Regions:
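Gly/Ala-rich beta-loop-alpha elbow adjacent to hydrolase catalytic centers
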Residues: 23-32
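Catalytic active-site module of serine/aspartate enzymes centered on a nucleophile-bearing elbow/loop
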Residues: 147-172
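Short, small-residue-biased leader/transition segments that mark boundaries at the very start
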Residues: 2-9
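The feature captures the conserved acid-bearing segment of alpha/beta-hydrolase catalytic domains
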Residues: 52-127, 132
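A conserved short beta-strand
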Residues: 40-56
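Active-site signature of alpha/beta-hydrolase-fold catalytic machinery across serine-
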Residues: 34-38
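Histidine-bearing beta->alpha loop at or near hydrolase active sites
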Residues: 137-147
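Conserved alpha/beta-hydrolase fold motif
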Residues: 22-23, 45
Length: 172
């Protein structure tokens, strides 16, 4: 398995700053899973609409076809995946993500990513982990785009994140 310069950089960053919480967004979600697997300094992950997920070998869900291409989980050795079960993980998804197949490219793209995210959370928890997926509209937080951190209500989302950090002892 290739370990490129980006992987080395992330591991070195956590070695330099010490233990911390990793916040990822979109395609960076995949890099976050790999960073946590390879960096014991990662104490938890907050992932905003991650784009790709890892699963233990032999447990990768079926591919999910969509208008924007096929969503595929990525297999990692079980011992690597199990490192994700040792830290709290929370995923956030905003509005405008349909439950059913649609002809809208953006909605379809995130529909399959949300569905795969649910399977990722199930896999982490099935292996003894602590993962949560929050669909913001379902908890009354509305109006969010894919860029949750820059939307007008980002302070409300930050408050939710802060509460999660406290609940998991990650605010110290």
């Amino acid at each position: 398995r290739s370990r490129g310069l980006g992987d080395v950089y992330k591991r070195q960053l956590f070695k330099r700053v010490g233990k911390g919480i990793l916040v990822t967004h979109s395609a960076g979600g995949f890099l976050g899973w790999l960073t946590a697997i390879r960096s014991p300094e990662v104490r938890g992950i907050i992932s905003l609409e991650p784009g790709t997920y890892v699963f233990p070998e032999g447990e990768v869900p079926e591919d999910m076809p969509s208008l924007t291409g096929t969503m595929k989980g990525i297999a990692v050795p079980p011992e690597e995946f199990n490192k994700l079960t040792q830290i709290p993980i929370i995923l956030y998804f905003g509005d405008y993500i349909p439950e059913n197949v649609t002809d809208k490219l953006g909605g379809e793209n995130w529909r399959v990513r949300l569905q795969m995210g649910r399977k990722f959370v199930e896999a982490v928890n099935r292996h003894g982990g602590n993962a949560v997926l929050v669909e913001l509209p379902k908890i009354g937080i509305r109006g969010n785009t894919h860029f949750l951190m820059s939307d007008k209500n980002n302070n409300i989302i930050a408050g939710h994140m802060a509460a999660w950090l406290r609940q998991n002892g990650l605010d110290r």
